[in-house]
Design a protein with these regions (language model features):
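Secretion-targeting segments and adjacent low-complexity export tracts
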Residues: 1-227
Protein backbone atom coordinates (compact mmCIF):
# COMPACT_ATOMS: atom_id res chain seq x y z
CA UNK A 1 0.00 0.00 0.00
CA UNK A 2 1.40 3.40 -0.99
CA UNK A 3 1.05 5.68 2.03
CA UNK A 4 -1.26 8.61 1.40
CA UNK A 5 -2.04 7.69 -2.20
CA UNK A 6 -5.60 8.33 -3.36
CA UNK A 7 -7.63 9.58 -6.31
CA UNK A 8 -10.19 12.38 -6.45
CA UNK A 9 -12.77 12.73 -9.23
CA UNK A 10 -14.64 15.90 -10.18
CA UNK A 11 -17.44 16.60 -12.64
CA UNK A 12 -17.90 20.02 -14.22
CA UNK A 13 -21.25 21.68 -14.84
CA UNK A 14 -20.89 20.89 -18.55
CA UNK A 15 -20.29 17.19 -17.85
CA UNK A 16 -16.51 16.91 -18.17
CA UNK A 17 -14.71 14.50 -15.84
CA UNK A 18 -11.32 15.35 -14.35
CA UNK A 19 -9.24 13.25 -11.96
CA UNK A 20 -6.19 13.84 -9.82
CA UNK A 21 -4.21 11.80 -7.33
CA UNK A 22 -1.98 12.65 -4.42
CA UNK A 23 1.34 11.49 -5.91
CA UNK A 24 3.71 13.38 -8.19
CA UNK A 25 2.62 15.07 -11.41
CA UNK A 26 0.97 12.99 -14.13
CA UNK A 27 1.79 9.85 -12.11
CA UNK A 28 -0.41 6.89 -12.91
CA UNK A 29 0.31 3.52 -11.28
CA UNK A 30 1.31 0.68 -13.58
CA UNK A 31 -1.68 -1.10 -15.08
CA UNK A 32 -4.16 1.72 -14.42
CA UNK A 33 -5.96 3.02 -17.51
CA UNK A 34 -8.01 6.19 -17.89
CA UNK A 35 -11.10 6.25 -20.12
CA UNK A 36 -10.79 8.49 -23.18
CA UNK A 37 -13.20 11.13 -21.86
CA UNK A 38 -11.44 11.49 -18.49
CA UNK A 39 -8.91 14.29 -18.09
CA UNK A 40 -6.00 14.18 -15.64
CA UNK A 41 -5.45 17.58 -14.03
CA UNK A 42 -1.70 17.38 -13.45
CA UNK A 43 -1.03 16.04 -16.97
CA UNK A 44 -2.74 18.99 -18.70
CA UNK A 45 0.02 20.66 -20.72
CA UNK A 46 -2.10 23.77 -21.31
CA UNK A 47 -1.48 24.69 -17.66
CA UNK A 48 2.00 26.03 -16.74
CA UNK A 49 4.01 23.27 -15.11
CA UNK A 50 5.03 25.51 -12.22
CA UNK A 51 1.36 26.04 -11.44
CA UNK A 52 0.70 22.30 -11.48
CA UNK A 53 3.60 21.79 -9.06
CA UNK A 54 1.66 23.77 -6.43
CA UNK A 55 -1.01 21.07 -6.45
CA UNK A 56 1.42 18.24 -5.59
CA UNK A 57 0.03 15.95 -2.85
CA UNK A 58 -3.29 17.89 -2.83
CA UNK A 59 -5.59 16.44 -5.51
CA UNK A 60 -8.63 18.51 -4.48
CA UNK A 61 -6.56 21.63 -5.21
CA UNK A 62 -5.62 20.03 -8.54
CA UNK A 63 -9.19 19.57 -9.77
CA UNK A 64 -10.10 23.06 -8.52
CA UNK A 65 -7.07 24.58 -10.26
CA UNK A 66 -7.77 22.70 -13.47
CA UNK A 67 -11.36 23.95 -13.56
CA UNK A 68 -10.29 27.51 -12.82
CA UNK A 69 -7.70 27.46 -15.62
CA UNK A 70 -10.33 26.33 -18.12
CA UNK A 71 -12.97 28.77 -16.81
CA UNK A 72 -15.20 25.88 -15.79
CA UNK A 73 -17.31 25.33 -12.68
CA UNK A 74 -17.29 22.09 -10.73
CA UNK A 75 -20.65 20.45 -10.13
CA UNK A 76 -19.34 17.90 -7.64
CA UNK A 77 -16.16 16.41 -6.21
CA UNK A 78 -16.04 12.71 -5.32
CA UNK A 79 -13.75 11.47 -2.51
CA UNK A 80 -13.85 9.68 0.84
CA UNK A 81 -14.63 11.41 4.13
CA UNK A 82 -10.96 11.29 5.18
CA UNK A 83 -9.88 12.83 1.89
CA UNK A 84 -12.27 15.75 2.35
CA UNK A 85 -10.79 16.55 5.78
CA UNK A 86 -9.33 20.08 5.90
CA UNK A 87 -10.43 20.77 2.32
CA UNK A 88 -13.53 22.54 1.10
CA UNK A 89 -14.02 21.63 -2.57
CA UNK A 90 -16.21 24.71 -3.00
CA UNK A 91 -19.00 22.65 -4.52
CA UNK A 92 -21.18 19.62 -3.79
CA UNK A 93 -19.36 16.74 -2.10
CA UNK A 94 -20.05 13.12 -2.97
CA UNK A 95 -18.61 11.07 -0.11
CA UNK A 96 -17.52 7.56 -1.00
CA UNK A 97 -18.00 4.72 1.45
CA UNK A 98 -15.75 1.68 1.55
CA UNK A 99 -18.38 -0.40 -0.26
CA UNK A 100 -18.41 2.10 -3.14
CA UNK A 101 -14.77 1.46 -4.02
CA UNK A 102 -14.20 -1.58 -6.28
CA UNK A 103 -11.51 -4.07 -5.31
CA UNK A 104 -9.99 -3.74 -8.76
CA UNK A 105 -9.40 -0.32 -10.29
CA UNK A 106 -8.91 -1.76 -13.77
CA UNK A 107 -10.69 0.13 -16.52
CA UNK A 108 -10.63 0.17 -20.27
CA UNK A 109 -8.92 3.17 -21.79
CA UNK A 110 -5.57 4.85 -22.25
CA UNK A 111 -2.47 3.49 -20.56
CA UNK A 112 -0.28 5.90 -18.65
CA UNK A 113 2.05 6.66 -21.56
CA UNK A 114 -0.92 7.50 -23.79
CA UNK A 115 -2.23 9.90 -21.13
CA UNK A 116 0.95 11.97 -20.74
CA UNK A 117 2.58 11.49 -24.17
CA UNK A 118 -0.05 10.41 -26.72
CA UNK A 119 2.21 11.00 -29.73
CA UNK A 120 4.98 8.86 -28.25
CA UNK A 121 2.46 6.13 -27.38
CA UNK A 122 1.05 6.14 -30.93
CA UNK A 123 4.51 5.96 -32.45
CA UNK A 124 5.53 3.06 -30.20
CA UNK A 125 2.35 1.18 -31.11
CA UNK A 126 3.11 1.63 -34.82
CA UNK A 127 6.63 0.16 -34.63
CA UNK A 128 6.96 -3.46 -35.71
CA UNK A 129 8.43 -6.04 -33.36
CA UNK A 130 11.62 -6.10 -35.41
CA UNK A 131 12.05 -2.35 -35.16
CA UNK A 132 11.70 -1.96 -31.40
CA UNK A 133 15.43 -2.13 -30.68
CA UNK A 134 16.00 0.81 -33.02
CA UNK A 135 14.11 3.01 -30.56
CA UNK A 136 16.73 2.39 -27.89
CA UNK A 137 20.16 3.93 -27.30
CA UNK A 138 23.11 1.53 -27.69
CA UNK A 139 23.26 -1.06 -24.93
CA UNK A 140 26.09 -0.53 -22.42
CA UNK A 141 29.09 -2.85 -22.62
CA UNK A 142 28.46 -3.87 -19.00
CA UNK A 143 25.67 -6.43 -19.22
CA UNK A 144 25.12 -6.66 -15.46
CA UNK A 145 21.76 -5.31 -14.26
CA UNK A 146 21.85 -1.91 -12.54
CA UNK A 147 21.49 -1.91 -8.76
CA UNK A 148 17.83 -2.10 -7.83
CA UNK A 149 17.06 0.62 -5.30
CA UNK A 150 13.37 0.80 -6.16
CA UNK A 151 12.06 0.12 -2.65
CA UNK A 152 14.39 2.63 -0.99
CA UNK A 153 13.67 5.41 -3.47
CA UNK A 154 9.91 4.79 -3.38
CA UNK A 155 9.99 5.07 0.41
CA UNK A 156 11.57 8.52 -0.04
CA UNK A 157 8.63 9.41 -2.30
CA UNK A 158 6.18 8.28 0.38
CA UNK A 159 7.96 9.89 3.33
CA UNK A 160 6.73 13.48 2.79
CA UNK A 161 3.16 12.11 2.69
CA UNK A 162 3.57 11.26 6.38
CA UNK A 163 4.03 14.96 7.15
CA UNK A 164 1.32 17.56 7.72
CA UNK A 165 3.63 20.35 6.52
CA UNK A 166 1.64 22.26 3.86
CA UNK A 167 4.85 22.65 1.81
CA UNK A 168 5.56 18.91 1.69
CA UNK A 169 4.95 18.89 -2.07
CA UNK A 170 8.45 20.15 -2.89
CA UNK A 171 10.19 17.33 -0.98
CA UNK A 172 7.77 14.84 -2.50
CA UNK A 173 8.48 16.03 -6.05
CA UNK A 174 12.24 16.09 -5.49
CA UNK A 175 12.09 12.47 -4.35
CA UNK A 176 9.90 11.66 -7.35
CA UNK A 177 12.57 12.95 -9.74
CA UNK A 178 15.12 10.59 -8.18
CA UNK A 179 12.68 7.69 -8.36
CA UNK A 180 11.78 8.46 -11.98
CA UNK A 181 15.43 8.52 -13.03
CA UNK A 182 15.97 5.16 -11.36
CA UNK A 183 12.80 3.65 -12.85
CA UNK A 184 13.88 4.89 -16.29
CA UNK A 185 17.24 3.13 -15.90
CA UNK A 186 15.59 -0.11 -14.78
CA UNK A 187 13.12 -0.01 -17.69
CA UNK A 188 15.90 0.61 -20.22
CA UNK A 189 17.79 -2.43 -18.95
CA UNK A 190 14.63 -4.55 -19.30
CA UNK A 191 14.13 -3.21 -22.82
CA UNK A 192 17.68 -4.13 -23.82
CA UNK A 193 17.47 -7.64 -22.36
CA UNK A 194 13.87 -8.64 -23.19
CA UNK A 195 13.61 -11.79 -25.28
CA UNK A 196 10.02 -11.34 -26.41
CA UNK A 197 8.62 -8.40 -28.36
CA UNK A 198 5.66 -7.97 -25.99
CA UNK A 199 7.97 -7.62 -22.99
CA UNK A 200 10.31 -5.32 -24.90
CA UNK A 201 7.47 -3.06 -26.02
CA UNK A 202 6.17 -2.82 -22.44
CA UNK A 203 9.66 -2.00 -21.14
CA UNK A 204 10.13 0.70 -23.80
CA UNK A 205 6.76 2.20 -22.85
CA UNK A 206 7.92 2.33 -19.23
CA UNK A 207 11.27 3.83 -20.24
CA UNK A 208 9.60 6.61 -22.23
CA UNK A 209 7.00 7.20 -19.51
CA UNK A 210 9.55 7.65 -16.74
CA UNK A 211 11.72 9.78 -19.01
CA UNK A 212 8.78 12.14 -19.59
CA UNK A 213 7.88 12.14 -15.90
CA UNK A 214 11.42 12.96 -14.81
CA UNK A 215 11.63 15.93 -17.19
CA UNK A 216 8.12 17.13 -16.31
CA UNK A 217 8.69 17.09 -12.57
CA UNK A 218 12.18 18.62 -12.85
CA UNK A 219 10.69 21.42 -14.94
CA UNK A 220 7.85 21.87 -12.45
CA UNK A 221 10.30 22.34 -9.58
CA UNK A 222 12.29 24.87 -11.60
CA UNK A 223 9.08 26.64 -12.65
CA UNK A 224 7.70 26.81 -9.15
CA UNK A 225 11.04 28.02 -7.70
CA UNK A 226 11.20 30.82 -10.27
CA UNK A 227 7.93 32.32 -9.00
Amino acid sequence: MDFGFFWVTAVTTDGQIVVANSYGLAYIPEGVNLPEQVRMASADESIPVGERAKWATYPILAVQGWAQHHNLRLRAVVATEDQFKNFDPGTAKVTLQADDIPESGKMQGRNRLAVIAPDAASHLASVSAGGLSELLPPAPSDTNPPADETAKLWFEVMKPMMSTNPDRGVAHLEAFVNYSEHAKEQALYRAHTAREAVAQRAAIADWIYWQHLSVLISDSLAGSAAK
